[in-house]
Amino acid sequence: MNYFELFGLPIQFELDGSLLSSQFRALQKRFHPDNFATASERDRLMAVQQAAQINDAYQTLKDSLRRAEYLLSLQGIEMKAEQQTLQDPMFLMEQMELREELESVTACADPEAALVAFDTKVTAMQRHYLAQLQGQLAQSEWLAAADQIRKLKFIAKLKNEVERVEDQLLG
């Protein structure tokens, strides 16, 4: 049983977050290890394993990038330990330029405002790539979706760097 089936959801990228959360709570309640306190050792172990699977499934499905990777894994495309790199020189150049721009934010006259503007730009870029990913997954364009996920991972790392710079400015 895959994660979507576990939660009674259609196997697709777009999902109803509130339905996912309510299904998660119901499954958590049903398979909580405390409910099996008087059960046999085997049943208690199975309950713990089931609870762990429910938690893993929820963490995967609630995160758009992890959900997309999981959808690809259902198609036989594994990205977790992949050695394939992104082959888009324009995108990679843009990422280098963005990182340089982020490094220069602290030297601006108003670094907080510069960081907010930079973050807004990166967030818009992230939304753009997520929309493209959604379309590619809906059209079963698995390899294009895999490339899009790679791009989104670069952007996620950049967003983490933005948070790091923000912490420096505030700290």
From Swiss-Prot:
Pfam families: HSCB_C (PF07743). One of its GO terms (biological process) is [2Fe-2S] cluster assembly. One of its GO terms (cellular component) is iron-sulfur cluster transfer complex. GO terms for molecular function: ATPase activator activity; protein-folding chaperone binding. Keywords: Chaperone. The keyword Chaperone applies. It comes from the Bacteria. PROSITE patterns: DNAJ_2. Gene3D superfamilies: DnaJ domain, HscB, C-terminal domain. Residues 2-74 form the J domain. HAMAP family: HscB. NCBIfam families: hscB, PRK05014.1. Belongs to the HscB family. Interacts with HscA and stimulates its ATPase activity. Co-chaperone involved in the maturation of iron-sulfur cluster-containing proteins. Seems to help targeting proteins to be folded toward HscA. This is Co-chaperone protein HscB homolog. It comes from Vibrio cholerae serotype O1 (strain M66-2). The gene is hscB.
